[in-house]
Curated annotation (Swiss-Prot):
Residues involved in UDP-alpha-D-glucuronate binding: 395, 400, 434-435, 462, 493, 527-536, 614
Source domain of life: Bacteria
List of residues binding (6R)-10-formyltetrahydrofolate: R116, I138, E139, R140, A141, D142
Site (Transition state stabilizer): residue numbering on this chain: N104
Keywords: Antibiotic resistance, Lipid A biosynthesis, Lipid biosynthesis, Lipid metabolism, Lipopolysaccharide biosynthesis, Multifunctional enzyme, NAD, Oxidoreductase, Transferase
CC per GO annotation: membrane
Gene that this polypeptide is encoded by: arnA
Organism phylogeny: Bacteria, Pseudomonadati, Pseudomonadota, Gammaproteobacteria, Pseudomonadales
Protein name according to UniProt: Bifunctional polymyxin resistance protein ArnA
Region (Formyltransferase ArnAFT): 1-307
């Protein structure tokens, strides 16, 4: 019986995959591809032309996961879906359309080099072997079980183009051998080893910048990874751009400074280790393809001249503006960025008690102020800095019902002004969305790109925080379509030292664990709202801040235009369970004798605790596939450890308060 397939394909390897399916006797019901981008150098074969010649129905929708296309694909009743170098992720509903599964051909030996442009990345990293992998598709990109692999040797002279040719040939051989077995159902699957996984994002022309302080071998690998038909490696010669198409490594650099011209015939440049001969290149985007010696003449180079590239002088630190720098996330993040050594932090807040320890750092600049008042300072620093984090917000549930208009004014209106400054000055914004935007979503795991955002009726004012954040998420997304660089991150119940203050808990304006600790410290009953059955996934602040720091670092631009949940799905617990573990650790703490006896648990109704207009959520569990894929991040700290650190901090704070009042 003939197997029916729907194919998603682009590039040479898309053509290779289609030919292999036809040769293996598959019926191709339809092919989905991309319209060629006029800005891209399309050196590869055309899937559209192949399908036209073979009489195969062809489509190029903007969104293949759209319900209209999903229904059309379901009506085709495919046995298999295949993806051959298709550039968009296929969603879970689409993958489920295939009766016998969905399969992807990836251009590396998975689990290594997941993600984009693997052929370029393996060359940049100096690998000696890569290959192709046929694997089952799951929701997470390039992570499904492996069915077949074929290795490809990388020769020292290989470029991205020659390696692509090798991969195309290997793909043809792999599919020739595997597709008949897959149709028979006798091709075994092997789960990927996640401990060996690596992920790489898209490359841009800017990634070709030559840093002469690096070893010549690394620069040679960069040149061959991005040479024609790609944009090329480059550096600056005065005001002119020098694009390097071919190079070779020569031992030694005569002890000269990186970037120094050692000779003009051949054109030889000193590197951090050894030197690089520039064999062929061109001057500027429209220049002629020339030999290195003629390039030296055209550019006016002489022995001893210096070429400019990355890190040609002291590297300027990335300037990060943190508004709300004294808050829980702000102060922990500032500490992490300053420790990294690559950042300069500028911050504003209405207080500074949590950041006193940072003020002595010469790369930390703090101004006490209010974002609603100090608009000139705010606009100037958005213009001055590279990355902006507007962390100022009211984020405690009791305030949503007690001061809903203030929540809207601060969380939406004031932050919208900051976002518009980022648009005006072309600055990247990393915006704190919230797990609250998912509201009463019924999905078992909340997915950034697929889960519905569900809130209650208008008379339940607690949702004003959720919808204020959601509306700003949507505004930022819309600005992103016009060129704003952004990342939205959604924290899921981060906990740790300096989360709140006990004074805040005394007036009810704090997070759950601070409220529970206050009851233990003061010897009052722990109040469990509606019995404390609500479940949350608690995340250690150190885990959360590490993920956020990676978003700010934004390696290879992979976080641009993305939404990222930052939470720990393994640390799910009810509020009652949180209280019970807190009590257990409190009773065992060395400072236990300094505090009153435990007064028990008391169940209270949410209305009596939060007031009218409150509505709770039974569970809130994140999918962290985006964080794993984009950040190579996985939370590691168990809830018990986080509770212990948080409890210890607040018990010592309580004793300091007592001493101050004595």
């Amino acid at each position: 019986m003939t197997s029916k397939a729907v194919v998603f394909a682009y590039h040479d390897i898309g053509c290779t995959g289609i030919e292999a399916l036809l040769n293996a006797g598959y019926e191709i019901a339809a092919v989905f591809t991309h319209a060629d981008d006029p800005r891209e150098n399309t050196f590869y074969a055309s899937v559209a032309r192949l399908c036209a010649e073979r009489g195969i129905p062809l489509h190029a929708p903007e969104d293949v996961n759209h319900p209209l296309w999903l229904e059309r694909i379901r009506q085709l009743r495919p046995d298999f879906l295949f993806s051959f170098y298709y550039r968009r992720l296929l969603g879970a509903e689409l993958l489920a359309c295939a009766a016998r599964g969905a399969y992807n051909l990836h251009g590396s030996l998975l689990p290594r080099y997941r993600g984009r442009a693997p052929a370029n990345w393996v060359l940049v990293n100096g690998e000696t072997q890569t290959g192709v992998t046929l694997h089952r598709m799951i929701e997470r990109a390039d992570a499904g079980p492996i069915l077949a692999q074929q290795a490809v040797a990388i020769d020292p002279e290989d470029t991205a183009l020659s390696l692509h040719g090798k991969l195309r040939k290997a793909a043809g051989a792999l599919l020739r051998d595997s597709l008949p077995l897959l149709a028979l159902g006798v091709l075994p699957e092997v789960e990927q080893d996640e401990s060996q996984a690596s992920h790489f994002g898209r490359r841009t022309p800017a990634d070709g910048l030559l840093d002469w302080h690096r070893p010549a071998r690394q620069l040679y690998d960069l040149v061959r990874a991005v040479t024609q038909p790609y944009p090329g490696a480059f550096c600056q010669v005065g005001e002119q751009k020098l694009i390097v198409w071919s190079a070779e490594v020569v031992a030694g650099n005569h002890g000269r400074e990186p970037g120094s011209v050692l000779s003009c015939d051949p054109l030889r440049i000193a590197c951090g280790e050894d030197s690089l001969v520039l064999r062929f290149g061109q001057r500027g985007e429209r220049g002629l393809y020339l030999a290195g010696t003629q390039l030296a003449t055209e550019l006016g180079l002489v022995e001893g001249a210096r070429l400019r590239g990355a890190a040609s002088g002291p590297q300027r630190r990335t300037r990060v503006l943190i508004l709300g720098v004294n808050g829980f996330i702000g102060n922990h993040l500032s500490e992490r960025l300053l420790r990294d050594g690559r950042y300069e932090v500028h911050g504003m807040d209405i207080g500074s008690d949590a950041i006193e320890r940072l003020k002595a750092d010469p790369h930390f600049h703090f101004v006490e102020g209010d974002i609603g008042i100090h608009s000139e300072w705010l606009e100037y620093h958005v213009k001055k800095c590279d990355v902006v984090l507007p962390l100022v917000a009211i984020a405690t549930p009791i305030e949503y019902t007690r001061n809903p208009l203030r929540v809207f004014e601060l969380d939406f209106e004031e932050n919208l002004r900051i976002v518009r400054y980022c648009v005006k000055y072309g600055k990247r914004v990393v915006f704190p969305s919230t797990s609250e935007v998912y509201g009463m979503c019924q999905d078992p795991d909340f997915d950034e790109d697929r889960s519905n955002l569900v809130v209650g009726p208008i008379n339940k004012q607690r949702w004003i925080y959720s919808v204020s954040k959601q509306l700003l998420d949507r505004v930022i997304w819309a600005y992103g379509q016009q060129g704003l660089r952004f990342t939205l991150f959604r924290p899921f119940n981060w906990m740790g030292p300096r989360l709140d203050r006990l004074d805040s808990a005394r007036i009810g304006s704090s997070r759950a664990i601070t409220q529970l600790i206050l009851h233990l410290v003061e010897g009052t009953p722990i109040r469990l709202v509606d019995g404390g059955a609500q479940k949350r996934c608690f995340t250690d602040v150190d885990d959360g801040i590490e993920a956020l720091a990676r978003i700010i670092d934004n390696r290879d631009g992979r976080c641009d235009g993305q939404i990222v949940n930052i939470g720990n799905p393994d640390n799910e617990a009810s509020i009652r369970q949180l209280g019970e573990e807190l009590l257990r650790q409190f009773e065992a703490h060395p400072l236990r004798a300094q505090f009153p006896p435990f007064a028990g648990f008391r169940e209270v109704e949410s209305r009596s605790f939060y007031g009218d207009g409150y509505q709770d959520v039974a569970h809130r569990k994140p999918s962290i596939d985006n964080a794993r894929r984009l950040l190579d991040w996985q939370p590691t700290i168990e809830l018990r450890e986080t509770i212990g650190k948080t409890l210890d901090f607040f018990l010592h704070e309580a004793l300091r308060e007592r001493e101050a009042q004595a």
